[in-house]
Amino acid sequence: MSHNSFGHLFRVTTWGESHGPAIGCVVDGCPPGIPLTEADIQPALDRRRPGQSRFTTQRREADQVRILSGTFEGVTTGTPIALEIQNTDQRSKDYGDIAQRYRPGHADLTYDLKYGIRDYRGGGRSSARETACRVAAGEVARKILGAGITIRAALVRIGPHGIDRSRWDWSQIEANPFFCPDPVAAEQWAVYLDEIRKRGSSVGAVVEVIAEGVPAGLGAPLYGKLDSDLAAALMSINAVKGVEIGDGFDAATLTGEDNADEILAAPNEAGGPHIFGSNHAGGILGGISSGQPVVARFAVKPTSSILIPRRSVGRDGQPVEVITKGRHDPCVGIRAVPVGEAMVACVLADHLLRDRAQNGPR
């Protein structure tokens, strides 16, 4: 199995399976001399960690990260950074019933068709457990980006229920189990998701990621576009079925005069970005960052691991009925919030290093 790495100069390779002894990643391309310890990475992993509310999987993992290489006395050396997270709460017996059955909506069938073998325990390599590695790598990326670039994400929709953007409050993100910026919507979601959970079903969600302080000039025309790399990175997250930048598909409903972000002023003598009248483009024009906030959204499908019987076939081709036991998220979009932040951080760090390599320090 190839394609376990992403990035160009800032390159991340993840490894491990859901029910293996450990998961981890190797981060290559991090410059030397950057302070980095486990304490810098752990808070982000704690945000993604399972079992923190009734609305996420009850699998209990500490997700304690260990730095195995690439630092000396708390500072990066410029060599590959290896990060490891132990798996401690696997329950493989829950998956015995699907060893010879394909779960509808999962990667079981396609993995078997491609490789002729699959690890059915918790989905193996296709499990969202792998995203813990991305979150760890994302914290290394944030150290490269520095404090001037802020990357934050929020859940803006669960199923048919969206937020009221007039109530958007970043301080509410950590005050509820949904990473929701609208406290009223968060209360409504709790009632709705309880109903979904008690039925043994699941529901999808939309995550919005906003990166502020991104300098102008990141990205390149045509095949090196910043937005195409962001879209690819976000689409690679488990269960993601759609990505949009800025207004995305809503841009198709606008006229040219409404969609074009007017440029109101050039930078003053103190520097800073150009001033725009709007940000329909999501901070990227022609594949290159404009200095405005970079805005992306991605849609997460409902997990197919549900207690409601579904029709399928077994490896022998015979019809079967599948009920997925085990511990699963009723809405995987919740824990995708820190994953989205991490992937945006990795892409921005990669493009920042690529820009420096071509143009030198700005």
From Swiss-Prot:
One example GO MF annotation: chorismate synthase activity
Assembly description: Homotetramer.
Cofactor note: Reduced FMN (FMNH(2)).
Provenance organism: Granulibacter bethesdensis (strain ATCC BAA-1260 / CGDNIH1)
Name by which UniProt lists this protein: Chorismate synthase
NCBIfam families: aroC, PRK05382.1
EC number: 4.2.3.5
A Pfam family hit: Chorismate_synt
